[in-house]
Curated annotation (Swiss-Prot):
Sample GO molecular function, one term: tRNA binding
CDD domains recorded: TGS_ThrRS, ThrRS_anticodon, ThrRS_core
Keyword check for Amino-acid biosynthesis: no
Region (Catalytic), start-end ranges: 243-534
Function according to Swiss-Prot or TrEMBL: Catalyzes the attachment of threonine to tRNA(Thr) in a two-step reaction: L-threonine is first activated by ATP to form Thr-AMP and then transferred to the acceptor end of tRNA(Thr). Also edits incorrectly charged L-seryl-tRNA(Thr).
Organism whose genome encodes this protein: Photorhabdus laumondii subsp. laumondii (strain DSM 15139 / CIP 105565 / TT01)
Pfam families in alphabetical order: HGTP_anticodon, TGS, tRNA-synt_2b, tRNA_SAD
Name of this protein: Threonine--tRNA ligase
HAMAP family per record: Thr_tRNA_synth (MF_00184)
């Protein structure tokens, strides 16, 4: 006689085993209709799962995050159902959920076209609208294998042979004549899977191994209702308009080419943004009392073996050799900073020592994972390492947190999700060290009024960490900032200082990054602002245009005056209509366009327009420069008169 306890504390008693769906029906028809799955004693299960002993139960609906994930997973099965109807010889591989959707890897024997994708989506919708029940069967390993051997599903057979124990009872989900294998849970009926969209097809190696066959990965998105789907598709459309690769080309910021995959060729305007970003960060380094250093581009492989990087990260490192020595191009800056720390005797009075670098790093990322500036092989880290005592951890972490929020607020990022990752099962250091470290990080966050969530067991083996994930205007998440404690690396590389009692002690090292990678952060900013960079960081801040040749000298004089004031300005003296010039520079997102005609020459003023189309009228030149300099120096996000 199971007693089922619901989330509100109420209980229902049954005189026999009941399914999750039975309990939902007992509560009411509305909940039964909405029931997708259940959470029994904390574990997600199918709606058909039997409860035969006392249990805690939460009914999962499409309003729950878990419910939406289940809908997406079932849409992957729906895709499999449709593709096997259209192309029966297709071999199905894996079909997991991902952020906002799902994919399925398939072996079709030919490349899918856009027409194929449209046909596939149409068939999926036809099947979903039949509102058929999804039937789950738990079978023994041999029956599952026989099922997929008979169906010619080689990849499913391989999964069974290599990844599933002979003692397991795999779950087979029956979608009419189509059968798929999955841990589940899945929707009980396809009425939950009406709102989806297939998005794209890409290549993917079986099991992610380039030695295996290349499969086709079909991506899709799925939502609980039509409104959610349309909202997401509109967001995707807006994201496509803001794509930093597209805008980077339009604004002539940078380019990539095959001869240097994952490494940017910065053009003048893009490099201007890069240098402005560096200058801004340098002001913060000075404000927060950091030294700026520069380590070597590469070091002997022996160094990376000592740090443990070669063993754990070697496949992602570029190497070269000279005079029978093997060198590794650095993927990160920390070992170099410890070498600088080790030069000369250090006392506890020298700590904390804050060391920052705009380090040029390289990582051998897979070519298929490269994506504009967001995923590169060559990048610049705004990296810093703080060497301190255990007693100084709290204060230093608190300072790092302040710096992170200080920087992000300058760019207008307000939604920042913070996570504190705590000790993993396998770790170094004493329990006392971990207790103090975790308490110091949590206290520093609380001291700064930062809301955060714990990620138990997700810290590195050498120390806990804080992750800062900023959300952009489209609510996309970008993990940028980190504050990571390290009890291991300083000791591995023989870093030490003399304590108060003249004993040798190993410093704690705090790894700290704010922007992460400058390249990636510029990509994020490009998409956040859609290329409308705040004036202080805009590559061209002002363009001055003449209407006829008679204003050319006045324009040149004005440009020189602007440049002498430290404003990035240029002249446009082309023999084109003024409307054409304005349209062109508007498309180039130049913050201010100054128009000079006879009236302006006579009055010594300028006619000012913004890139958003606002006409600020005729303004005194000196007054305009004064206001513009205030906007630039304050790093204001808004333009004059906005």
């Amino acid at each position: 006689m199971p007693v089922v306890t619901l989330p509100d504390g109420s209980q229902r008693q049954f005189d026999h085993a009941v399914s999750v769906m039975d309990v939902a029906c007992d509560i009411g028809p509305g909940l039964a209709k909405a029931c997708i799955a259940g959470r029994v004693n904390g574990e997600l299960v199918d709606a058909c799962e039997l409860i035969d002993s006392d249990a805690n139960l939460a009914i999962i609906t499409s309003k729950d995050d878990a419910g939406l994930e289940i809908i997406r997973h079932s849409c992957a099965h729906l895709l499999g159902h449709a593709i096997k109807q259209l192309w029966p010889d297709t071999k199905m591989a894996i079909g997991p959920i991902i952020d906002n959707g799902f994919y399925y890897d398939v072996d079709l024997g030919r490349a899918l076209t856009q027409e194929d994708i449209e046909l596939l989506e149409k068939r999926m919708l036809e099947l979903a609208k039949k509102d058929y029940d999804v039937i789950k069967k738990k079978v023994n390993w041999q029956e599952a294998r026989d099922t997929f051997v008979a169906r010619g599903e080689d990849y499913k057979v391989q999964i069974l042979d290599e990844n599933i124990s002979r003692d397991d009872r795999p779950g087979l989900y029956n979608h009419e004549e189509y059968i798929d294998m999955c841990r589940g849970p899945h929707v009980p009926n396809m009425r939950f899977c009406h709102h989806f969209k297939l998005q794209k097809v890409a290549g993917a190696y079986w099991r992610g191994d380039s030695n295996n066959k290349m499969l086709q990965r079909i991506y899709g998105t799925a939502w609980a209702d039509k409104k959610q789907l349309n909202t997401y598709l509109q967001r995707l459309e807006e994201a496509a308009k803001r794509d930093h690769r597209k805008i980077g080309k339009q604004l002539d910021l940078y380019h990539m080419q095959e001869e240097a995959p994952g490494m940017a060729f910065w053009h003048n305007d893009g490099w201007t943004i890069f240098r402005e970003l560096e200058t801004f960060v340098r002001t913060k380094l000075k404000e927060y009392q950091y030294q700026e250093v520069k380590g070597p581009f590469m070091m002997d492989r022996v160094m990376w073996e000592r740090t443990g990087h070669w063993e754990n990260y070697g496949e992602h490192m570029f190497t070269t050799s000279s005079e029978n020595r093997e060198y590794c191009v650095k993927p990160m800056n920390c070992p170099g900073h410890i070498q600088i720390f080790n030069q000369g005797l250090k006392s506890y009075r020298d700590l904390p020592l804050r060391m920052a670098e705009f380090g040029s790093c390289h990582r051998n990322e897979p070519s298929g994972a490269l994506h504009g500036l967001m995923r590169v092989r060559g990048f610049t880290q705004d990296d810093a390492h703080i060497f301190c005592t255990e007693e100084q951890i709290h204060r230093e972490v608190s300072s790092c947190i302040k710096m992170v929020y200080d920087v992000y607020s300058t760019f207008g990022f307000e939604k920042i999700v913070v996570k504190l990752s705590t000790r993993p099962e396998k770790r170094i250091g004493t329990e006392e060290q971990w207790n103090q470290a975790e308490e110091s990080l949590a206290a520093a966050l609380q001291e700064n009024g930062v809301q955060f969530e714990y990620q138990p067991g997700e810290g590195a083996f050498y120390g806990p960490k804080i992750e800062f994930t900023l959300h952009d205007c489209l609510d996309r998440a970008w993990q940028c900032g980190t504050v990571q404690l390290d009890f291991s690396l300083p000791g591995r590389l023989s870093a030490s200082y003399v304590g108060e009692n003249n004993e040798r002690k190993v410093p704690v090292m705090i790894h700290r990054a704010v922007l992460g990678s400058l390249e990636r952060f510029i990509g994020i900013l490009t998409e956040e602002y859609a290329g409308f960079f705040p004036t202080w960081i805009a590559p061209q801040q002002v363009v001055v245009m003449n209407i006829t040749d008679s204003q050319a000298d006045y324009v040149q004089e004005l440009v020189k005056k602007l440049q002498d004031a430290g404003i990035r300005a240029k002249a446009d003296l082309r023999n084109e209509k003024i409307g054409f010039k304005i349209r062109e520079h508007t498309l180039r997102r130049v913050p201010y366009m100054l128009v000079c005609g006879e009236k302006e020459v006579e009055s010594g003023k300028v006619s000012v327009r913004t890139r958003r189309g606002k006409d600020l009228g005729s303004i005194d030149v000196n007054g305009f420069i004064e206001k513009l300099l205030i906007e630039i120096r304050s790093r204001n996000l808004h333009q004059l008169e906005e």
